[in-house]
């Protein structure tokens, strides 16, 4: 077993304990990790202070969540790229119902007109016989 090497699964990441870079970290990388952890701890402490405040009267606004919501919903046009698929879907969604209802009404009207001309349709509320 001493010669066997760990082979990661194709869709799973390598565990950090088996990653050789986990223990051979340069001072700059370690400094960046410590800085990120300190920012995260500060933000977490700030959130917990707001969350556990007994005099809180409104909800806590998370700026990252607000930015994400804005980018997801209200700001779609700068991120929109027209493609043939988008164009086809837009045409189907825009003109498809119009064409469908035109076909339904036109065929129904033509069928009734043909039955009237053949005298097979009983027109109950016809005023001008």
Swiss-Prot record:
The modification Phosphoserine is found at residue 26. It is a single-pass membrane protein. The keyword Transport applies. Belongs to the complex I NDUFB4 subunit family. The modification N-acetylserine is found at residue 2. One of its GO terms (cellular component) is mitochondrion. Keywords: Acetylation, Electron transport, Membrane, Mitochondrion, Mitochondrion inner membrane, Phosphoprotein, Respiratory chain, Transmembrane, Transmembrane helix, Transport. It holds the Pfam family NDUF_B4. Complex I is composed of 45 different subunits. InterPro entries: NADH_UbQ_OxRdtase_NDUFB4_su. Its main location: mitochondrion. Accessory subunit of the mitochondrial membrane respiratory chain NADH dehydrogenase (Complex I), that is believed not to be involved in catalysis. Complex I functions in the transfer of electrons from NADH to the respiratory chain. The immediate electron acceptor for the enzyme is believed to be ubiquinone. The chain crosses the membrane at residues 88-105. It comes from Mus musculus. GO terms for biological process: aerobic respiration; proton motive force-driven mitochondrial ATP synthesis. It comes from the Eukaryota. It is found in: Mitochondrion inner membrane. This is NADH dehydrogenase [ubiquinone] 1 beta subcomplex subunit 4.
């Amino acid at each position: 077993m001493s010669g066997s090497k760990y082979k990661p699964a194709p869709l799973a990441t390598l565990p950090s304990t088996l990653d050789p870079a986990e223990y051979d970290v340069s001072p700059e990388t370690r400094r960046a990790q410590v800085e990120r952890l300190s920012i995260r701890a500060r933000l977490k402490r700030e959130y917990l202070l707001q969350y556990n405040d007994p005099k809180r009267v409104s909800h806590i606004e998370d700026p990252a969540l607000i930015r994400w919501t804005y980018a997801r919903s209200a700001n779609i046009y700068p991120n929109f790229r027209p493609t043939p698929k988008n164009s086809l879907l837009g045409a189907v969604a825009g003109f498809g119902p119009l064409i469908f209802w035109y076909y339904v009404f036109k065929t129904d009207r033509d069928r009734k007109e043909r039955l009237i001309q053949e005298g097979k349709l009983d027109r109950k509320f016809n005023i001008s016989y």
